[in-house]
Regions:
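A glycine-anchored, Pro-Gly-centered beta-turn/N-cap motif
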Residues: 451, 508, 588-590, 642-644
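C-terminal beta-strand-rich structural cap/linker in extracellular carbohydrate-active enzymes
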Residues: 525-551, 646-657
Length: 662
């Protein structure tokens, strides 16, 4: 590795010169000179310090969310028109806007990846999204509905089209605003291309760009840069934003020893917190959330909270917890889930948790699971049922899949509002589950802000191998007053009975809040808790206590098992408009016995209700009545007259079904 170069630093030998620099005007059109919090307008009212720990954030990719003026590009007015959806139909009361500043690459085409991280002007909004007045109107509309709104801030680098960079390339008064060296150095922080030094288009030296050539790094060893970036934050907080998410925080300042997470980087964020963020406490408390893409290193991640003496971020985005949710389902192993479940550090420090975002983190959750709603609901519940601050990436609340593009553009496609409307009217949809879970969080704010998580150890064993089974996860969240028991099936099989070590948990009285039904399926079996009739990929939430609670969400599920699938089980598709379940099979002229199962469980089926073990004969196109009660019912018998595709339809209102040839 070559000898590292230090970012150029100007040393000021006296306080007079220091003051001159501090009050100097940065006058090249990419600066405003705004300073104090006393200029703040359009602010939220009645906010208390730590409000972010009670907030559920909705992450919006502005270009793709809602196109109000019909020009092919999402905009501020489109977001404003959908605030009732965000607040009432979903239940989020915070919004994170992806980059909104004027940027180098712009495109309204769906195939154009206008991401905004190549900032051209920090003091101007992207004209494709609307005007600054449109943005201020959106901010005010959010506050009128008690919705907080934060912006995406990119301090590490600008775009090449930024006037600062042009001046720097030409050797002007901002030459030292970027990182230059006379030759290429072997610097590779591990992001983007390994070639991080690029030729000056107007000179013979080289500039550093940690991510890619089009995003040159600012020089935070330059006092003017440090102060100007603080001014940018002040400018937008004064416009009414409630906080900011800061991008790529790890790469701000390089040293001889490291290119990431340096003490100098932490020092600047302490300055930003102390001099800017905390100065708004008496007006309207602001907060900043850190994007430090760190996995499997809690100490490095937690370092961005700072210390008691040198505070930094109010919140850090947690890249471990979302991946833990996915891996626990993929591996069908509850130990992965519980080992990556962390609670908020305190009432004013928080982990921001999510299961997918705009980057190549994990992709769209619906695409991971092939659009299978049961798994999508399961991972959504895993993410929201923990004492952290949730961030929902637009579209994930309806199980939106990836677009037909390469790279991260596939994660940034237009939201399907037709699908939104359909799910709004389906009380068993992915959207309805998200709404129910967010409502649950609002009902028990203390529990989800600073509750304690306790894992229930599995005491279930494989009857053949005698090894412990980990296909169902369970833990409690408690704040000393209220307790929730959360149970998750991590495999595409039913579990008639599953046992956990109950410890000191008293389950003598409980209510089912979320699940396939609200039947009594929790009991004490010796020193163990026994959970019964768990459907594949089911989420079940119990309120533990004497107070009787209403069920918040019923997941409507039905399975068909019979000769056509080897007496396995296939989940039927639910049609909320027709209130029925459908499933299609290609069948030959033969005899097929079958029945409908409520939980993929033999003992809880809708069958003929007769003693004829050969099955009750079912004619084509004739509505048939099943047993009205679930139990060990006998089979139905169907004999197609010809080969073809047959649709089995089960109507939930009266437990009838019909078979039709397609």
């Amino acid at each position: 590795m070559g000898e590292p170069a230090m970012k150029k630093v100007k040393f000021y030998l006296c306080a007079v010169l220091l003051c001159i620099v501090f009050f100097a005007s940065c006058s090249d059109g990419n600066s405003d000179g705004s300073s104090g919090s006393e200029d703040a307008k359009h602010q939220s009212t009645d906010l208390k310090d730590g409000w972010w720990n009670d907030t559920a954030f909705y992450h919006i990719w502005v270009k793709s969310f809602c196109d109000y003026d019909g020009d092919g590009c999402g905009d501020f007015n489109g977001i404003k028109s959908k605030l009732d959806y965000i607040k009432n139909d979903l239940g989020c009361d915070g919004i994170w806007l992806s980059p909104i500043f004027e940027c180098d690459y712009k495109s309204k085409s769906p195939s154009g990846n206008m991401h905004g991280y190549d900032v051209k002007d920090y003091y101007a909004v992207n004209s494709y999204f609307g005007t600054e007045d449109d943005l201020l109107s959106l901010i005010q509309a959010c506050h009128d509905k008690n919705i907080k709104i934060i912006f995406d801030f990119v301090p590490n680098h600008t775009g090449k089209g930024n006037a600062w960079f042009t001046n720097s390339c030409e050797g002007g008064n901002k030459k030292d605003w970027y990182v230059w060296n006379n030759s290429k150095l072997n610097w590779n922080p591990g992001m983007g291309s390994s070639d991080t030094w690029h030729k000056n288009p107007k000179g013979n030296d080289y500039y550093y760009a940690a991510f890619w050539e089009g995003q040159p790094d600012l020089n935070f060893r330059n006092y003017e840069v440090r102060e100007e970036m603080k001014n940018v934050v002040r400018y937008w907080l004064n416009k009414g934003f409630d906080g900011l998410r800061i991008d790529a925080v790890r790469y701000l300042i390089e040293t001889e020893n490291s290119l990431v997470d340096t003490p100098e980087t932490h020092a600047w964020f302490n300055e930003l917190r102390k001099e800017v963020i905390d100065s708004y406490k008496e007006i309207s408390p602001k907060f900043m959330v850190c994007e430090a893409w760190i996995e499997n290193n809690r100490s490095a991640l937690n370092a961005y909270f700072g210390s008691e003496e040198k505070t930094e971020f109010n919140m850090v985005l947690d890249f471990d917890q979302g991946r833990g949710c996915y891996n626990s389902i993929y591996e069908s192993d509850s130990r992965i889930l519980t080992s990556t479940l962390y609670k908020n550090p305190s009432e004013i420090k928080a982990y921001g948790t999510f299961i997918g975002n705009h980057d190549e983190y994990m992709g769209r959750i619906a695409s991971w699971f092939g659009g299978y709603s049961a798994e999508i609901k399961l991972i959504s519940a895993m993410s929201l049922l923990r004492p952290t601050v949730p961030f929902i990436y637009y579209g994930n609340e309806i199980g939106m899949q990836e677009g037909n593009y390469n790279g991260d553009l596939r994660l940034r496609t237009k939201l399907n509002w037709t699908n939104v409307e359909k799910q709004r009217n389906d009380d068993s949809s992915i959207l309805s589950l998200n709404k129910a879970l967010l409502a649950l969080r609002k009902e028990y704010p203390s529990l989800f802000k600073n509750g304690t998580v306790k894992e229930l150890k599995s005491s279930t064993v494989n009857t053949e191998t005698k090894n412990p089974l980990y296909t169902v996860a369970a833990y409690t969240i408690s704040d000393g007053k209220d307790t929730l028991l959360c149970v998750f099936s991590l495999k595409n099989v039913s579990d008639n009975k599953f046992w956990f070590d109950c410890g000191d948990l008293d389950i003598s009285s409980y209510s089912v809040l979320i699940g396939v039904n609200n039947e009594k399926n929790l009991s004490l079996d010796g020193s163990d808790i026994k959970v019964e009739y768990i459907a594949p990929y089911e989420t079940r939430v119990y309120y533990i206590g004497d107070d009787k609670k209403e069920m918040l969400f019923t997941d409507k599920r039905l399975f068909l098992r019979g000769d056509m699938n080897g007496w396995g089980y296939d989940e039927m598709l639910y049609d909320s408009e027709k209130r029925c379940f459908d499933l299609w099979y290609k069948l030959d002229p033969d005899s097929y016995q079958f029945k409908f199962d409520a939980y993929c469980d033999w003992t809880l089926s809708y069958g003929s209700g007769e003693e004829n073990t050969a099955g009750k004969t079912v004619p084509l196109d004739k509505e048939m009545q099943t047993s009205t009660e679930k139990g060990e019912n006998t089979n139905f018998l169907f004999t197609p007259l010809s080969s073809g595709t047959y649709r089995f339809t089960f109507y939930e209102d009266d437990n009838t079904f019909v078979i039709r040839q397609e």
